[in-house]
A protein has these predicted regions:
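N-terminal polybasic phosphate/anion-binding patch
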Residues: 1-71
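Anionic-ligand binding patches
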Residues: 42-194
């Protein structure tokens, strides 16, 4: 059994890790979830803020845990929004610390484009993007990395209450958060030994 510390209390992230290890490494996992609350890290990382926030959550988890050698891996998973000229791009950053050999690995991927093509089905998208921009302008100085206090999913859920705030991409873009994370874990597969 692989023992993991997850720098999150997200059930989606926990279940994704369990499924990925079962399917790809043919093993079961035991996961200890740790909530990392840091007022300097933005709830919604933007641009490079996702990778940096992911790194900080990993570092904070390592500092917070006693007896790390009881575990095989410490994992941090963070979604962020990259702002491009004509679209928003949701990506996943994953950082893994192999406790036994004291090495860290990272990958970014799972790209999901939020473009003007969604306007036909989601006419309130400009309002969502405007509110994200306003949140950024009001709160980005509160954080050490690029980001804001309202997540894109929370804003989507405000305008479309039937869309889950933690898995908005499944409804808007047809890609489930779980499969998005699994794709990035696949990139790290060769680094993870059991």
């Amino acid at each position: 059994m692989v023992k993991i510390i997850l720098a999150s209390e997200s059930p989606i992230k926990e279940n994704t890790l369990k499924q990925w290890f079962k399917e790809n490494k043919k093993c079961s996992v035991s996961i200890k979830k740790i909530s990392i609350e840091d007022n300097l890290l933005p709830p919604q990382p933007l641009n490079t803020g996702g990778s940096l926030t992911c790194s900080d959550r990993l570092k904070n988890t390592l500092n917070k845990c006693d007896n790390l050698l009881k575990y095989d891996y410490v994992i941090s998973i963070e979604n962020s929004i990259i702002i491009d000229d004509s679209k928003l791009i949701d990506v996943v950053d994953i950082k893994i610390k192999d406790v036994l050999i004291d090495k860290e690995y990272s990958a970014t991927g799972g790209r999901i484009d939020v473009t003007h093509k969604l306007l036909n089905d989601y006419g309130k998208l400009p309002l969502i993007i405007e509110e994200l921009q306003e949140s950024y302008e009001k709160t980005n100085r509160n954080y050490i990395y690029d980001g804001c206090d309202k997540t894109f999913g929370e804003i989507v859920n405000k305008y479309y209450p039937n869309i889950q705030s933690n898995n908005w991409m499944r409804t808007l873009c047809g890609v489930d958060r779980k499969s998005q994370i699994m794709n990035v874990l696949d990139e790290l597969s060769s680094k993870i030994s059991v």
